[in-house]
């Protein structure tokens, strides 16, 4: 397994993995009446293949198998870039999904390298891939002089245990898309 910068050709896998991280319920909260998960998947694939969106392949690292299949992905970017990067998603939600999400809560802020999404396909779980992806994102954050930050659903104690084991610490509580979340950070070593 190797961790590499994603390429445009990985866009569909990136979209599927982001949706896996979000859960179907959360994805359906992002679409308007008469729209489906397939519609959301197409929008996310287009955003992942774009140059400037929070879900762009440019903001993504992928875990590749020996035969170059995508096993997992992690999407991360500088918190200060959230609004500029999110614009493409908000525009697509309005135009293609029939949903105005302009009032969505900010999940990050300036001063952190935000891990937006991390997921591994079910067939590749329990192999340390999520940990490897997270370590790579933490390293990228620290090389930029920033702590790595993320949100974890309070209903997902397994993910919280993993993040804690990798050095993340609780900062505060946040609400995001109707879910109670814990904001955690992994600071640069002194």
Report residues per predicted region:
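Conserved GNAT-fold acetyl-CoA-binding loop/helix
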Residues: 25-48, 94
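A short helix-loop-beta-strand connector motif used in the catalytic cores of GNAT acetyltransferases and
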Residues: 47-62, 80-85, 114
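Conserved beta-strand in the GNAT
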Residues: 62, 69-78, 114, 119
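Conserved acyl-donor/pantetheine-binding loop and adjacent beta-alpha core of acyl/acetyltransferases
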Residues: 78-113, 117
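Conserved GNAT acetyl-CoA-binding A-motif
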Residues: 111-113, 141-153
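Conserved beta-strand-loop-alpha-helix junction that forms the acyl-donor binding cleft
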Residues: 115-125, 150-159, 176-181, 186-189
């Amino acid at each position: 397994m190797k961790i590499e910068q994603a390429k445009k050709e990985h866009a569909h896998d990136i979209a599927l993995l982001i949706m896996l991280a979000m859960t179907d319920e959360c994805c359906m909260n992002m679409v308007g009446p008469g729209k489906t998960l397939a519609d959301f998947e197409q929008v996310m694939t287009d955003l992942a293949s774009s140059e400037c969106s929070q879900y762009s392949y440019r903001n993504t690292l992928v875990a590749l198998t020996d035969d170059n299949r995508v096993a997992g992905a992690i999407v991360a970017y500088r918190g200060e870039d959230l609004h500029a990067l999110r614009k493409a998603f908000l525009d697509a939600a309005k135009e293609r999904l029939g949903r105005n999400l302009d009032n969505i809560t900010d999940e990050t802020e300036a001063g952190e390298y935000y891990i937006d999404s991390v997921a591994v396909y079910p067939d590749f779980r329990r192999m340390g891939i999520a940990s490897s992806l997270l370590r790579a994102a933490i390293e990228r954050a620290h090389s930029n002089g920033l702590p790595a930050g993320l949100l974890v659903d309070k209903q997902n104690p397994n993910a919280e245990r993993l993040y804690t084991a990798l050095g993340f610490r609780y900062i505060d509580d946040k609400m995001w898309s109707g879910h109670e979340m814990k904001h955690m950070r992994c600071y640069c070593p002194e």
